[in-house]
């Protein structure tokens, strides 16, 4: 029986790995690891904490009694105190030194930052998987000619591979920003109730050097290079905003690619993967909708808007802190990562499974090449001694007449027939075929594709080969 709300990010979209990172188990076992790191560091700096107490804490990092914690929270109305009590019940000898000198934000904020670091690493692997898939696609289709579209009107031809490099470049920029944020994202450390570390200064009897050493030890034990230099009760929420802007950038790139694919699906030049028994419409049995790309666009819009939410939170924190960030962040941060995880999983799936239809592209090229080739035809005739202005006007008139035949009367275009019949253009069928060779119109597209892959993509993938995420199935 399902009679309560389920978050579709968990029930339909996000991977189990990302869901685990934002699970209660991960969060509160990290609380306990932070309490252990604090106690170990305090002992190392001379506080009276016994090895027996530390061993007891180490033995109970993951066996969390969530029912007991819920009972405590119902009574105390404080989730951190509830888990302090629950951990203390599991570690009665250590109960008196758990959370010694700390405030709630010691575990809350540090866990959030550790969570974001872990989630960014997971997204990094998934982003690399998309880049890897796109690099294979671009290399395979480097020479496949296709119409380019500007203003969604036919323009000079390009190749399918060259178009894919535009998507690739966006994702590479996202990878660069993600890695930069990950490299500099600190933890909050242990700075006490208002960021002054007064409680720890008292514990260490005024020894400021030990207070500074405490933070360094905790950061090392948690595997993070540094702590944020200063804070109020909380770390600056600008860090959340910076991270969310990375996620927003990934969503923007994904939506751009998915939108392009949706347009190409309409033109019948490309299809996303479509399962053997997949149904496109409950009414129209013939439908083959690009639903995965549509989902990418839908989730991307959500992530981009969540990024604005974190900016609002960062700028509305009062003085050393207010709690109006709490409920908002509990929703915004996990859901942004879960959605971004789903987006990248879908993108890799679509790119690896999409089908390209060169024959359809050739048809579209044949329809447009007569118009695209007129400049070359004009230049050749002028080189043979004809008047440019006179022939330019002739081409304009023939083009208008052809467009009317196509649009008003539904006929095939007759532009080439009219140009062949006009002796001023000095054309023969053989010459015309040569002038219409699509290879004359794609410029450096194949070479640009290969150079971009060799110079900008393959080195990135080679140096990070072990970090590329494996395939994750799309559930629905």
Model-based region annotation:
Residues 234-269, 278-339:
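A conserved active-site cap/scaffold subdomain adjacent to cofactor or substrate pockets
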Residues 77-80, 127-134, 164-178, 247-257, ...:
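Alpha-helical transition-metal enzyme core signature, strongest for iron centers
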Residues 139-161, 271-287, 320-327, 352-372:
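Glycine-rich cofactor-pocket loops
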Residues 1-198, 206-219, 280-281, 291-295, ...:
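A helix-coil-helix interface module used to build multimeric assemblies
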Residues 271, 394-401:
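Active/binding-pocket-proximal capping segment
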Residues 216-233:
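A short, charged helix-loop
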Residues 162, 241-249, 376-384:
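Short, well-ordered beta-strand elements within core beta-sheets of diverse protein domains
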Residues 302-388, 394:
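Long, amphipathic alpha-helical stalk/connector segments used for oligomerization, subunit docking
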């Amino acid at each position: 029986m399902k009679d309560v709300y389920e978050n579709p990010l968990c029930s339909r979209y996000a991977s189990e790995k990302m869901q685990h990172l934002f699970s209660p188990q991960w969060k509160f076992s990290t609380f306990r690891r932070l309490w252990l790191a604090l106690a170990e560091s305090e002992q190392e700096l001379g506080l009276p904490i016994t090895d027996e107490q530390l061993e007891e804490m180490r033995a109970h990092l993951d066996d969390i009694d969530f029912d007991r914690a819920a009972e405590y929270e119902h009574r105390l109305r404080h989730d951190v105190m509830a888990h302090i009590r629950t951990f203390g019940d599991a570690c009665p000898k250590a109960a008196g030194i758990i959370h010694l000198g700390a405030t709630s934000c010691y575990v809350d904020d540090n866990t959030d930052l550790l969570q974001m670091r872990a989630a960014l690493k997971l997204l990094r692997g998934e982003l690399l998987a998309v880049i890897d898939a796109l690099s294979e696609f671009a290399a395979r289709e480097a020479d496949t000619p296709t119409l380019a579209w500007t203003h969604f009107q036919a323009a000079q031809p390009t190749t399918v591979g060259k178009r894919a490099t535009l998507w690739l470049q966006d994702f590479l920029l996202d990878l660069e920003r993600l890695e930069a944020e990950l490299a500099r994202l600190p933890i909050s450390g242990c700075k006490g109730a208002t960021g002054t570390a007064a409680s720890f200064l008292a514990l260490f009897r005024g020894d400021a050097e030990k207070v500074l050493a405490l933070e360094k030890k905790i950061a090392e034990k948690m595997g993070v290079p540094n702590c944020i230099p200063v804070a109020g009760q909380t770390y600056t929420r600008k860090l959340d905003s910076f991270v969310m802007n990375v996620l927003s950038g990934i969503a923007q790139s994904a939506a751009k690619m998915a939108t392009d694919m949706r347009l190409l699906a309409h033109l019948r030049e490309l299809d996303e993967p479509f399962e053997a028994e997949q149904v496109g419409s409950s009414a129209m049995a013939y439908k083959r909708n690009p639903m995965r790309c549509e989902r990418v666009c839908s989730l991307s819009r959500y992530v981009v808007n969540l990024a604005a939410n974190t900016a609002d939170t960062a700028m509305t924190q009062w003085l050393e802190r207010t709690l109006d960030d709490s409920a908002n962040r509990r929703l915004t941060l996990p859901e942004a990562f879960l959605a971004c995880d789903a987006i990248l999983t879908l993108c890799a799936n679509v790119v690896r499974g999409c089908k390209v239809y060169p024959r359809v592209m050739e048809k579209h090229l044949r329809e447009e090449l007569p118009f695209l080739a007129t400049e070359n035809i004009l230049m050749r005739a002028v080189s043979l001694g004809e008047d440019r202005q006179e022939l330019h006007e002739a081409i304009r008139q023939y083009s208008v007449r052809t467009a009317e035949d196509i649009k008003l009367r539904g006929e095939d275009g007759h532009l080439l027939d009219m140009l062949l019949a006009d002796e001023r253009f000095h054309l023969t069928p053989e010459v015309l075929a040569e002038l219409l060779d699509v290879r004359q119109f794609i410029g450096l597209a194949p070479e640009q594709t290969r150079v971009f892959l060799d110079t900008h993509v393959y080195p990135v993938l080679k140096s990070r080969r072990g970090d590329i995420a494996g395939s994750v199935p799309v559930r629905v």
